[in-house]
């Protein structure tokens, strides 16, 4: 799927965990899809040597995928997106799941049992702050109704976070001069639990009765990033060097108290 001009996207997960649908602000580059696993088998036999092509056998769906970008706002309306990326489900070592409702000009879609697998905090000079999201879901459904009850309230105004302040330090050494691009990326490495069974496979006749993934395991998490800096005459002597176990501090926003703030420890660069 590809987003159009009349885009509406809701998540049923709010900061208070009460499952009220909340409308998200996203850029037009929203995309989502789901494919099926095609297993093939040979048709060629002793008596039918001409059957060179293998036949298809579809029984299960792969996990669905989605991708969108949300702006960083001065208001706290969209903090839920960051929380779904970062926070563990209460009392567990796994992630919260949620539902996405997507309205396009001519149809509506729903992604069930969504989980965010990748989030990139985008910091670019002359651009507003943004958060890029990628994720997976168990099932993509077409032609469903948008949630109309109990919608989460949004602030009356939306103020995008400008980058009036950008500071970076690595191992207590400031790198502010010449910085033009910074990104911080959190990867949630998940694996969908096996869901192909003989009994269920016998009941598969079409897409509606296919087997879909339902549960996943969080295998590991990786936090990485990059810093773009123009080459200057007094460039730091750490160029083309590496260090481990050092702190990295990044602040980007309208001031050093607003926007994206990272105080990372035990980093390697």
What function would you assign to each model-found segment?
Residues 1-269:
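Signature of extracytoplasmic/envelope-associated structural regions
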